[in-house]
Protein backbone atom coordinates (compact mmCIF):
# COMPACT_ATOMS: atom_id res chain seq x y z
CA UNK A 1 0.00 0.00 0.00
CA UNK A 2 1.49 3.34 -1.03
CA UNK A 3 0.53 6.96 -0.65
CA UNK A 4 -1.34 8.57 -3.52
CA UNK A 5 1.18 10.98 -5.07
CA UNK A 6 0.76 13.79 -7.61
CA UNK A 7 3.49 15.57 -9.58
CA UNK A 8 3.73 19.35 -9.86
CA UNK A 9 6.15 21.93 -11.15
CA UNK A 10 7.34 25.01 -9.29
CA UNK A 11 9.02 26.78 -12.23
CA UNK A 12 11.20 28.94 -9.99
CA UNK A 13 12.59 26.00 -8.04
CA UNK A 14 12.52 24.63 -4.53
CA UNK A 15 13.58 27.86 -2.78
CA UNK A 16 10.57 29.57 -4.36
CA UNK A 17 8.38 26.71 -3.15
CA UNK A 18 9.63 27.15 0.42
CA UNK A 19 8.93 30.89 0.24
CA UNK A 20 5.41 30.29 -1.08
CA UNK A 21 4.65 27.73 1.61
CA UNK A 22 5.89 30.11 4.30
CA UNK A 23 3.62 32.88 3.02
CA UNK A 24 0.49 30.82 2.37
CA UNK A 25 -2.33 31.38 4.82
CA UNK A 26 -4.29 28.17 4.31
CA UNK A 27 -5.53 26.29 7.32
CA UNK A 28 -4.86 23.05 5.46
CA UNK A 29 -2.26 20.97 7.23
CA UNK A 30 0.85 19.91 5.37
CA UNK A 31 4.32 18.63 6.20
CA UNK A 32 7.34 18.80 3.90
CA UNK A 33 9.59 15.74 3.76
CA UNK A 34 12.55 14.47 1.76
CA UNK A 35 15.48 16.69 0.81
CA UNK A 36 13.86 19.87 2.10
CA UNK A 37 13.14 18.36 5.53
CA UNK A 38 16.78 17.26 5.80
CA UNK A 39 18.11 20.80 5.22
CA UNK A 40 17.85 22.05 8.83
CA UNK A 41 19.76 19.03 10.12
CA UNK A 42 22.18 17.68 7.53
CA UNK A 43 22.10 19.50 4.20
CA UNK A 44 23.52 17.18 1.54
CA UNK A 45 23.09 19.40 -1.50
CA UNK A 46 20.57 21.91 -2.80
CA UNK A 47 17.15 20.28 -2.91
CA UNK A 48 15.94 19.52 -6.42
CA UNK A 49 12.79 17.61 -5.46
CA UNK A 50 10.31 18.31 -2.69
CA UNK A 51 7.83 15.91 -1.12
CA UNK A 52 4.82 17.41 0.66
CA UNK A 53 2.20 15.49 2.61
CA UNK A 54 -1.30 16.96 2.79
CA UNK A 55 -4.88 15.76 2.90
CA UNK A 56 -5.93 17.72 -0.21
CA UNK A 57 -3.13 17.96 -2.81
CA UNK A 58 -5.16 19.83 -5.45
CA UNK A 59 -6.15 22.59 -3.04
CA UNK A 60 -2.65 23.07 -1.63
CA UNK A 61 -1.12 23.06 -5.13
CA UNK A 62 -3.62 25.68 -6.32
CA UNK A 63 -3.05 27.87 -3.25
CA UNK A 64 0.69 28.05 -3.85
CA UNK A 65 0.53 28.21 -7.63
CA UNK A 66 1.99 24.86 -8.65
CA UNK A 67 1.42 23.46 -12.14
CA UNK A 68 0.32 19.82 -12.48
CA UNK A 69 2.67 17.81 -14.71
CA UNK A 70 2.83 14.22 -15.95
CA UNK A 71 6.65 14.28 -16.14
CA UNK A 72 9.44 16.53 -14.92
CA UNK A 73 7.93 17.30 -11.51
CA UNK A 74 10.07 19.02 -8.91
CA UNK A 75 7.29 18.84 -6.30
CA UNK A 76 5.51 15.66 -5.27
CA UNK A 77 2.39 16.06 -3.16
CA UNK A 78 1.11 12.95 -1.42
CA UNK A 79 -1.93 12.01 0.61
CA UNK A 80 -0.34 10.15 3.53
CA UNK A 81 -1.34 6.58 4.36
CA UNK A 82 -1.18 7.51 8.02
CA UNK A 83 -1.43 10.76 9.97
CA UNK A 84 1.90 9.90 11.65
CA UNK A 85 3.67 12.16 9.13
CA UNK A 86 2.02 15.12 10.86
CA UNK A 87 3.36 14.11 14.29
CA UNK A 88 6.58 15.52 15.75
CA UNK A 89 6.90 18.08 13.00
CA UNK A 90 9.02 21.19 13.39
CA UNK A 91 9.27 24.58 11.75
CA UNK A 92 12.13 25.60 9.46
CA UNK A 93 12.10 28.84 7.44
CA UNK A 94 8.44 29.23 8.50
CA UNK A 95 7.34 25.94 6.92
CA UNK A 96 6.29 22.69 8.59
CA UNK A 97 8.74 19.83 8.09
CA UNK A 98 8.37 16.18 9.10
CA UNK A 99 10.42 14.59 11.86
CA UNK A 100 13.95 13.63 10.77
CA UNK A 101 13.06 9.95 11.12
CA UNK A 102 10.23 10.38 8.60
CA UNK A 103 12.51 12.32 6.25
CA UNK A 104 15.04 9.46 6.36
CA UNK A 105 12.37 6.87 5.57
CA UNK A 106 11.15 8.91 2.60
CA UNK A 107 14.64 9.65 1.30
CA UNK A 108 15.82 6.04 1.49
CA UNK A 109 12.90 4.97 -0.71
CA UNK A 110 13.03 8.00 -3.02
CA UNK A 111 14.35 8.47 -6.56
CA UNK A 112 17.70 9.72 -7.84
CA UNK A 113 20.13 10.85 -5.17
CA UNK A 114 17.48 10.60 -2.41
CA UNK A 115 18.89 7.33 -0.97
CA UNK A 116 22.35 8.92 -0.63
CA UNK A 117 20.74 11.91 1.10
CA UNK A 118 18.90 9.50 3.39
CA UNK A 119 22.14 7.72 4.32
CA UNK A 120 23.79 11.08 5.01
CA UNK A 121 20.90 12.24 7.24
CA UNK A 122 20.79 8.89 9.06
CA UNK A 123 24.53 9.10 9.81
CA UNK A 124 24.06 12.64 11.11
CA UNK A 125 21.13 11.49 13.29
CA UNK A 126 23.22 8.72 14.86
CA UNK A 127 25.96 11.22 15.75
CA UNK A 128 23.60 13.96 16.98
CA UNK A 129 20.74 12.24 18.81
CA UNK A 130 20.66 14.94 21.47
CA UNK A 131 20.02 17.59 18.79
CA UNK A 132 17.06 16.05 16.97
CA UNK A 133 15.35 13.91 19.60
CA UNK A 134 12.69 15.72 21.54
CA UNK A 135 12.55 15.63 25.33
CA UNK A 136 9.53 13.29 25.15
CA UNK A 137 11.63 10.72 23.31
CA UNK A 138 14.21 10.41 26.07
Protein language model regions, located:
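Short gly/ser-rich loop at a beta-strand->alpha-helix junction or flexible surface loop bordering the NTP-binding
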Residues: 2-81
Amino acid sequence: DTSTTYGFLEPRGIDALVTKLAKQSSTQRYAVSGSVAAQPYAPYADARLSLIYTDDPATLAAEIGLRPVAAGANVLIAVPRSPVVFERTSTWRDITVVAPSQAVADLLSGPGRNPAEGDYLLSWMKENEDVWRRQLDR
